């Protein structure tokens, strides 16, 4: 299984997060860099661990949290959907298991503050 720590060190993913943050900064949004995605990732993992979810689900929550705003690279509007599509590609190319991809992509695609719903434990 692909790990959260492996993703954090991935140069391609780091580039997308950096550029998404730059785009949002140019539009006047608050910080969405590594501090933000790391905080979301760690918080999601902590919540699931505290609630007694499996270590696998905790890891998937960390991964989803880390990638959740990557769609801001494309545009802030509908960033959860574009982020889910981007995450699918990134995870698939890293040989992530299909069931893990499905869980992560569903969580990312449903995280938008205006329309998101917790469709699974990772979301």
Regions found by a protein language model. Give the residues of each.
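Active-site flanking loop/helix segments enriched in acidic
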Residues: 14-49, 66-73
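Divalent metal-dependent catalytic cores for phosphoryl transfer on phosphate-bearing substrates
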Residues: 51-123
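N-terminal glycine-rich anion-binding loops that anchor highly charged ligand groups
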Residues: 11-18, 56-59
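Charge-dense, low-complexity intrinsically disordered segments
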Residues: 7, 27, 31-34, 77, ...
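Generic serine detector
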Residues: 3, 23, 33, 41, ...
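Non-catalytic interface/linker regions that flank or bridge core catalytic/transmembrane domains
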Residues: 1-15, 23
